[in-house]
Curated annotation (Swiss-Prot):
The keyword Plastid does not apply. The UvrABC repair system catalyzes the recognition and processing of DNA lesions. A damage recognition complex composed of 2 UvrA and 2 UvrB subunits scans DNA for abnormalities. Upon binding of the UvrA(2)B(2) complex to a putative damaged site, the DNA wraps around one UvrB monomer. DNA wrap is dependent on ATP binding by UvrB and probably causes local melting of the DNA helix, facilitating insertion of UvrB beta-hairpin between the DNA strands. Then UvrB probes one DNA strand for the presence of a lesion. GO terms for molecular function: ATP binding; ATP hydrolysis activity; DNA binding; excinuclease ABC activity; helicase activity. Keywords: ATP-binding, Cytoplasm, DNA damage, DNA excision, DNA repair, Excision nuclease, Helicase, Hydrolase, Nucleotide-binding, SOS response. The beta-hairpin motif is involved in DNA binding. Residues 431-597 form the Helicase C-terminal domain. InterPro entries: Helicase/UvrB_N, Helicase_ATP-bd, Helicase_C-like, P-loop_NTPase, UVR_dom, UVR_dom_sf, UvrB, UvrB_inter. CDD domains: DEXHc_UvrB, SF2_C_UvrB. A motif (Beta-hairpin) lies at residues 92-115. This is UvrABC system protein B. It comes from Xylella fastidiosa (strain M23). Residues 26-183 form the Helicase ATP-binding domain.
Length: 669
């Protein structure tokens, strides 16, 4: 059902927000293509954008620089628009090792990946919403510029069912298999269907909790209803329903066979080229690999690495950009680029890295040249496809200022009256000892501390040293996966530890009101980690606390430091003036600590196959156990974990796995 965006919130725009919303909406309706929303941390940028979305009533794509921030934005927009389609579109790989060849050592690395089915379902839900309704907001990462199935094919393949429609059961089953649904009479899982007499049950690939029941009588659809696959209970009756393909890459049998013919033509042409260059090994390798893929496609309709033939399957010309999520957007949509100073360069970098790897594969006979067209968009191609846009950042880059041609809307005043953190400069020589005393002072007040270092080694050494001093500390580094990163941030807010150390991970979008001190070590070392925008962003992490401070440990004031300090002081001055004029007393942000992405954590409600299950855990004080007791407890828990796994109780097994990990940490500590 398509409706209007309805913003649900217990507060109304205040401070700079009303003027910013009005200006953004007016410019959008005036046809201004690019705008900049320059908003300080805690000024309500997300809420401001939500108000803009409600007023313009257009499908919206919000791009974020990483999965952590995308998850946070998804949670916030979901709360603002509970009655509308708020969707999540990020890479569905939990693990991804791309296909690669290293000529120096003659090493070929096969593609290896692990797909997160929950995120795949959310991606399918996002594209279905974009094609079927107008009140849709999709939160995405740079995954949005990577190749996807063509929307025309996706739409043409869908199965539209209406009450009273004439359709034979055999015809219905054939159509479902064309959509790549599998028949499963034992367990109705997402992307499958079952047949019981004249009743066909389908669990749509994009559905989170509800399956479709199609009741036929004498070749006619007598009843359509959504039901709970676990209990069988009917949720609601329907007049009409569209079943979309199980995957974005589904295509018709005719298109697949046509692609096989064009791939054969390309293979013949490229083999002649390789033989002409006397590359006999490469030619033999390519012929063998491609022939195997062609046989698989002809027999079963797909093969491993079928995405490398996407140009043939979509009918695109050589060099033509692949279809992406942007092709699913209507022309009048709104694009919001959050933390644009990071996201914009990221978009520009994707194509080059992908290209160099694939050129090696093509040169040495592992892939046909058409594999080069299975790629992300080039930056200029992305620009052409982008609808009217709003760049959102506390520190917009030169590109954003140039593109917006002066249309910069500022959000400097916070609704809470909070002013930007006070900045202190302290000497490097005593930075660690001084940091310890500052941390202890914050802990006494019940506050948290963020510390940013220049190198991984320094972060590790500092974490180890502070831990030895009795400080509860964690280290956030690039090897930690998305879900665990979300959990670490949540644990910091909950007070399970007091200090978080990082390198380049403490900047954009980490919303932690409990943090009152940000310490930047070696602030006078010029570089991208200590650039003006990096410093402003890092300092801003303490801006949600009334006691917010930033300490820059430096022996000299660099140009970047001076620019960051001057800009922060300009904002502080404007904020103080506004507070004085309106009689506002600053107060810290109070935000409930909740999971920003449902199903992201163990220990929260995990939705699967139409049921909500809560995994409860009894808190345990592992610190009170000695080494022998810890070893014995771990042995008992491991036996329980394996038993749960044998009984297919994987959520309980995962919970115990986490308990074992905490025991192991307690034993090492």
């Amino acid at each position: 059902m398509t409706g209007l965006f309805q913003l649900v919130s217990s507060y109304s725009p205040s401070g700079d927000q009303p003027a910013a919303v009005q200006k953004l909406v007016t410019n959008f309706h005036a046809g201004i293509a690019k705008q900049v929303l320059l908003g300080v941390t805690g000024s309500g940028k997300t809420y401001t954008i939500a108000n803009v979305v409600e007023q313009i009533q257009k499908p919206t794509l919000v791009m974020a620089p990483n999965k952590t921030l995308a998850a946070q934005l998804y949670g916030e927009f979901k709360a603002f628009f509970p009655h509308n389609a708020v969707e999540y579109f990020v890479s569905y790989y939990d693990y991804y090792q791309p296909e690669a060849y290293v000529p120096a050592s003659d090493t070929f690395i096969e593609k290896d990946s692990s797909i997160n089915e929950y995120i795949e379902q959310m991606r399918l839900a996002a594209t279905k919403a974009l094609l079927s309704r107008s009140d849709v907001l999709v939160v995405a990462t740079v995954s949005a510029i990577y190749g996807l199935g063509a929307p025309e094919d996706y739409l043409s393949l869908r199965l539209i069912l209406s009450l009273g429609e004439h359709i034979e059961q055999r015809q219905l089953i054939r159509h479902l298999t064309e959509l790549q649904y599998t028949r499963n009479e034992l367990d109705l899982v997402r992307g499958s269907f079952r047949v019981r007499g004249e009743v066909v049950d389908v669990f749509p690939a994009e559905s989170e909790m509800e399956a479709l029941r199609i009741e036929l009588f004498d070749g006619e659809i007598e009843s359509l209803s959504l039901f709970d696959p676990l209990t069988g209970q009917t949720v609601r009756k329907l007049q009409r329903f569209s079943v979309y393909p199980k995957t974005h890459y589904a295509t018709t049998r005719e298109r697949t066979l046509s692609a096989v013919d064009t791939i054969k033509d390309e293979l013949k042409e490229y083999l002649e080229l390789l033989y002409g260059r006397n590359k006999l090994v490469e030619a033999q390798r390519l012929a063998q690999r491609t022939q195997f893929d062609l046989e698989m496609m002809a027999e079963v309709g797909y093969c491993n690495g079928i995405e490398n033939y996407s140009r043939h399957l979509t009918g695109k010309a050589p060099g033509e950009p692949p279809p992406t999520l942007f092709d699913y957007l209507p022309p009048d949509a709104l694009l919001v680029i959050d933390e644009s100073h990071v996201t914009i360069p990221q978009i520009g970098a994707m194509f080059k890295g992908d290209r160099s790897r694939k050129e090696t594969l093509v040169e040495f006979g592992f892939r046909l040249p058409s594999a080069l067209d299975n790629r992300p968009l080039r930056f200029e191609e992305w620009e052409v496809r982008s609808p009217r846009s709003i760049y959102v950042s506390a520190t917009p880059g030169s590109y954003e200022f140039r593109e917006s041609a002066g249309e910069v809307i500022e959000l400097l005043v916070r609704p809470t009256g909070l002013i930007d953190p006070e900045i202190e400069i302290r000497p490097v020589a005593t930075q660690v000892d001084d940091l310890i005393s500052q941390i202890n002072a914050c802990i006494k007040l019940g506050d948290r501390v963020l510390v940013t270092t220049l190198t991984k080694r320094m972060a590790e050494n500092l974490t180890e040293y502070l831990s030895e001093q009795g400080i509860r500390i964690r280290y956030l580094h690039s090897e930690i996966d998305t879900v665990e990163r979300v959990e670490i941030i949540r644990d910091l807010r909950l007070g399970k530890f007091d200090v978080l150390v990082g390198i380049n991970l403490l900047r954009e979008g980490l919303d932690m009101p409990e943090v009152s001190l940000v310490a930047i070590l070696d602030a006078d070392k010029e570089g991208f980690l200590r650039s003006t925008s990096s410093l402003i962003q890092t300092i801003g992490r303490a801006a949600r606390s009334v006691r917010g401070r930033a300490i820059l440990y430096a022996d000299k004031v660099t140009r970047s430091m001076r620019a960051a300090i001057d800009e922060t002081e300009r904002r502080r001055q404007k904020q103080k003036e506004y507070n004085a004029e309106n009689g506002i007393v600053p107060k810290s942000v109070v935000r409930p600590i909740s999971d920003i992405l449902e199903g992201a954590r163990d220990g929260v409600e995990v939705k699967s196959k139409g049921k909500g299950r809560r995994v409860d855990e009894v808190p345990a004080d592992y610190g009170a156990l000695n080494q022998a007791e810890i070893a014995a407890q771990m042995k008992v828990l491991e036996q329980k974990m394996y038993q749960h796994a044998r009984d297919l109780e994987f959520e309980d097994a995962a919970r115990i796995r986490d308990q074992i990990q905490r025991l192991r940490e307690a034993g090492l500590g």
